[in-house]
Amino acid sequence: MLVSYNWVKEFFQDFPLTAEELGEAITRTGIEIEGVEELSASLKNVVVGEVLSCERHPDAEKLNKCLVQTDEEEPVQIICGAPNVAAGQKVIVAKVGARLPGGLKIKRAKLRGEVSEGMICSLAELGFESKVVPKAYADGIYVLPEHVETGVSAITLLGLDDAILDMAITPNRADALSMNGVAHEVGAIIHQKPAQPTEPDVSEKGKADDFISVEVENPTETPYYAIKMVENIEIKESPLWLQTKLMKAGIRPHNNVVDVTNYINLLYGQPLHSFDYDKIGSKKIVVRSAKDQEEITTLDGEKRILQTGHTVITNGTEPIAIAGVMGGEFSEVTETTTTVALEGAIFSSSSVGKASRELYLRTEASIRYDKGSDAWKVEKALAHGGALIAELSGGTLVGGVVEVDNREKAVNKIETSLTRINRILGTEISLSEIETIFDRLGFVLEVKEDTLIIEVPTRRWDITIEADILEEVARIYGYDEIPVTLPATSTTGGLSDSQKARRVMRAYLEGAGLNQALTYSLTSKKDATRLALSDEKTVALSMPMSEEHSHLRTSIVPQLIRSASYNIARKNMDVALYEMGTVFYATEGDNLPIEQEHLAGLITGNWHTADWQKTPKPVDFFVLKGIVEGLVNKLGIEAELHWKQIEKEELHPGRTASIQLEGKEIGYLGALHPAVEASYDLKETYVFEINVKALLDATKEKVVYHPIPRYPEMTRDLALLVDKDTDHATISQVIKEHGGNLLVDIELFDIFEGESLGENKKSLAYTLTFLDSERTLVEEDVQKATNKVVEALQAKLHAIIR
């Protein structure tokens, strides 16, 4: 947010800080100031001039020869190329010797044989961005009001003797998205109460009820909606003070009605919207949910397709505005407007945020509604806006408002204690200092023995728990005043077994070719339930920053999918990621959620890229399966993993398996469903997710060192014909159980399916390796062990030896 230093000073009688000092002070209290720009730093010798005469340059069609009176005794001749320059205008003149932004210095010059002693300036030449210059002056010079005195400083007149503070407002401090909010923050810093904005004293006539009525169908989405009427208005340019305030805040002036709504938004942080009353086409406004595929053409001339869940303002039949986002072209205020219906409302942040994101339409209004606003300042903002429109347009302010009010006001009181504040902050703040801090913040403090009861004003809706109060105390007391303390301990530092295991896991996965990812624990309601290991309920935030970050995740995989999609959209086609992080499950009542540490991974694209030696190898199920099995081996886990084919929503039904260890399911591994891959523009993609605690709790095998075998091993190949639904894990287990002590390895080297084998049959071929560390094996030993294996396979699995 761009904040005018001079505007801040208007809230206080005696302001003690320079712009630079103010920026530093605000940063120290927790709101970052990204920069302070002195607008007049590169401006000098710029005054108001009056164009006495204007005629075409004799040798150039696009140049004008102007005689201009400035603060000098005699008028000067200036050659000007602006298409809108004319005699009788009050203009901005950079005199000879003047300095302008970009290092430009004005000199006496000759243009096509005619002397030019200065320059008539556009706003862009004074440093204003082109996007904030009024459209009427976008391609020419800026024409000042006729009443402006000739010869005075244009720098002062345009408010350029000012500094702009660029404030980086975090989502939790949306109260500072207004000048009133900034003034309260500054007041707490300099220990002064800011003056409250006052509306013009304009008499009212008539009743708003005679003009319009209001109906709200969903009070949850629209707790408050009101209309203020102003009639007999004249649409014209806003006064210079209003235009300059808007331009310095990065907003383009339009006319005296639209500019007032933008000004009130800046002043109070409360969006207003103006309708041309005569274009509404009805004497009734209905606020309702949009119908699916309903259409509206917005003020930017774009046709928008609405969805269920968007809130719209209608004339009872068709939409005239998207609530909290943008008005409709249908009811736009234009030069012919004579009566304005001024809207002031509170819309739910979720509804506005949803519409803004889905329509790709982010406005100053939607930003404030999405981040939250003070529900109890809307009447003040609406009254001020209506009175100011009446004053600037010469209109008649209609008495009263038409409103629907479903707000519920609750006093926000939070308890803490002086002892607790000092213990947590590590300070020795006295009670009198605490009282001063809350007085500076504008909070009401009640002391009952050692208990402090703090009543928080509605303008600070971000403060809801004790920790917020402690943060406010720390901010105003001064982070740099809090003493640095170190914990006293005599315990020698070291890594726990679980910390060592986690390091081993990370090192192994990175060695296997995966890159570590770090994603948000916050996600959308939709993603919160996707691909979870457990069916437990999700955890919703009470005050989410947005709908996209409204729930705590129950699985890491959806975030990795988004990360892969982001990379592939930027032509990074081979992606291999892993993340070790926390997932959350809801508990009954107000108990804290269950937290579990999970490990998740994703691979897509080619596992081996092509070079002069080999062709590229795409990722597949067995690549990721091998990585997971290698991880278990690296951790020294005694039990083997077992894989069981399962079906899981959003995963491929034929390429998904549960991961089982010591008889418990600890995770899953599989390919994404083709529909999911298509929705994220992914090619074949494989994912896994494992409960880390289950891995770390598994029995670790003791490391036993054996000498390298002195005797040779012997192998036997077995080809089995079995039912199609008999899996490799089952066959391998039977072989292990009956192979005896001499069997040291089993390797599956071939799988074949075909009509020649018979219906629902498949052939699997294994190599069995036998070894005796004490002596050389003889044929009889190996044959005896092999026969036992064959008999067991025939008896238990009805296998046919081929």
Curated annotation (Swiss-Prot):
One of its GO terms (biological process) is phenylalanyl-tRNA aminoacylation. Its main location: cytoplasm. PROSITE patterns: B5, FDX_ACB, TRBD. Residues 409-484 form the B5 domain. It catalyses: tRNA(Phe) + L-phenylalanine + ATP = L-phenylalanyl-tRNA(Phe) + AMP + diphosphate + H(+). InterPro entries: aa-tRNA-synth_II/BPL/LPL, B3/B4_tRNA-bd, DNA-bd_dom_put_sf, Fdx_antiC-bd, Fdx_antiC-bd_sf, NA-bd_OB-fold, Phe-tRNA-ligase_IIc_bsu, Phe-tRNA-ligase_IIc_bsu_bact. Keywords: Aminoacyl-tRNA synthetase, ATP-binding, Cytoplasm, Ligase, Magnesium, Metal-binding, Nucleotide-binding, Protein biosynthesis, RNA-binding, tRNA-binding. The keyword tRNA-binding applies. GO terms for cellular component: phenylalanine-tRNA ligase complex. It comes from the Bacteria. Its EC number is 6.1.1.20. Its cofactor is Mg(2+). Mg(2+) binds at D462, D468, E471, E472. Residues 40-155 form the tRNA-binding domain. Binds 2 magnesium ions per tetramer. Residues 709-802 form the FDX-ACB domain. GO terms for molecular function: ATP binding; catalytic activity, acting on a protein; magnesium ion binding; phenylalanine-tRNA ligase activity; transferase activity; tRNA binding. It holds the Pfam family B3_4. It is an enzyme of class 6 (ligase). It is found in: Cytoplasm. Belongs to the phenylalanyl-tRNA synthetase beta subunit family. Type 1 subfamily. Tetramer of two alpha and two beta subunits. This is Phenylalanine--tRNA ligase beta subunit.
